[in-house]
Amino acid sequence: MKKNLTELVFILDRSGSMGGLEQDTIGGFNAMLTRQKEQEGEANVTTILFDHEVQLLHDRFPLKAVAPLTEKDYYVRGCTALLDAIGYGVEKMANIQRHLPESERAEKVIFVITTDGLENASKRFGYEKIRRMIEREKEQYGWEFLFLGANMDAVKEAARFGISSDRAVRFENDTQGVAVNYHVVSETVSRMREAPCCASIGAEWKEQIEADFQKRHHR
């Protein structure tokens, strides 16, 4: 196990319903990367974009070498192949960790999955297969998965593929909501990278996102 090395895997929705929030997403993602670069410790970044297709943007790039996201990288189109994106990411990272020498395997693996809509276009993976894959990596290797979903019951949806309620949150999919999302994700990933054990981070990480959503939907 390589101490102080974290594999960061970002799975970002770029389906058509994200239209109008491209600059917010790009700005939030880049600010998060800047914050992570300032932190001690090594990290590799894998970024997977998805609509009706899955695109690998960053393939375990050293964190400090990752260039800012641009409009050429992130543009919206199509439907939501959420399960295919998750399955691709988990399968890829598991294969890498399995075949690396023990001394080179990351101490921590953290997935951050962000979507503004429910699965509707996957062809390769289904809910049950994804659930088994995620639960295996969580239980055997301590991987962490954060799920941020808009326009849905995010806790209920996350449970369908093996992510517990304390790691799932619903957000408001607008400029303010996206900004809060990336601020909280950056803070949480930083805490997980610093912590002796990611599991020590409780459900409190998502309180700011929940408060933002509830404030705008208070009756």
Protein language model features and the residues they cover:
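Acidic, low-complexity intrinsically disordered regions
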Residues: 1-219
